[in-house]
């Protein structure tokens, strides 16, 4: 199943759109892929291109925070992290709304389901958006993700979201206890995480991608 890609600009940021055949008579999954810190949507696209998913509209946005040398992040570290995460929440909610509008302009009376996945800080982005974002979510996956400092506002409690959390015991960037803590926090907030501890390091590998395919297509 080959995917067609095009690059566009939404909310003043680069977004790569990818799709295969879409059947508007069935629910269409909108799958947002968040790259890691100091990275690019192209790096995430390399992995996303190996996800063979049915009836899925993929998008790979560029992070709003300039990390230098053409690389991007979702928020800044340090004392301003909470405010920066709040800006990320607004930015990402806009991107999801624009994806919905994009499909609604092409198809009549369609049902869309919002899904998120990400690696490292991108996994953290998916988890934060699940906790505090404005859109309802169908499924969420995090690989080597964690939770940053979050703004002091109420978390969502409207629905239970299935979450696949993959993390490695040999990860020297995001220690497994941080990833596990983040997923437990998701559970404490009413969501349904499946914790998958592996011997991997800080990476997104072929076995991870197979699990992601099974998760999003089930």
Where are these regions (language model features)?
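Short beta-strand/loop motif that positions the catalytic acidic residue
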Residues: 164-167, 171
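Gly/Ala-rich beta-loop-alpha elbow adjacent to hydrolase catalytic centers
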Residues: 117-122, 126
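C-terminal catalytic histidine-bearing segment of alpha/beta-hydrolase fold enzymes
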Residues: 180-218
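Short alpha-helix in the alpha/beta-hydrolase fold that links the catalytic acid
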Residues: 44-47, 175-185
């Amino acid at each position: 199943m080959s995917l067609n890609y095009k690059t566009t600009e939404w909310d003043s940021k680069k977004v790569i759109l990818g799709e295969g055949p879409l059947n508007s008579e069935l629910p269409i999954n909108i799958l947002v892929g968040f790259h890691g810190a100091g990275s690019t949507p192209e790096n995430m696209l390399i992995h996303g291109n190996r996800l063979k998913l049915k009836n899925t509209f993929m998008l790979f946005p560029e992070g709003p925070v300039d990390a230098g040398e053409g690389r991007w992040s979702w928020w800044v570290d340090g004392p301003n992290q909470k405010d920066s995460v709040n800006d990320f929440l607004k930015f990402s909610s806009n991107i999801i709304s624009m994806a919905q509008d994009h499909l609604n302009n092409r198809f009549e009376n369609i049902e869309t389901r919002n899904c998120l996945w990400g690696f490292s800080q991108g996994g953290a982005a998916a988890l934060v958006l699940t906790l505090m974002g404005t859109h309802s979510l169908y499924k969420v996956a995090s690989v080597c993700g964690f939770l940053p400092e979050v703004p002091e506002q109420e978390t969502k409690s409207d629905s239970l979201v299935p979450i696949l959390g993959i993390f490695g015991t040999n990860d020297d960037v995001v220690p497994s206890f941080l990833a596990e803590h983040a997923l437990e926090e998701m559970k404490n907030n009413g969501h349904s995480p499946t914790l998958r501890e592996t011997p991997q390091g800080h990476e997104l590998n072929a076995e991870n991608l197979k699990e992601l395919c099974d998760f999003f297509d089930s």
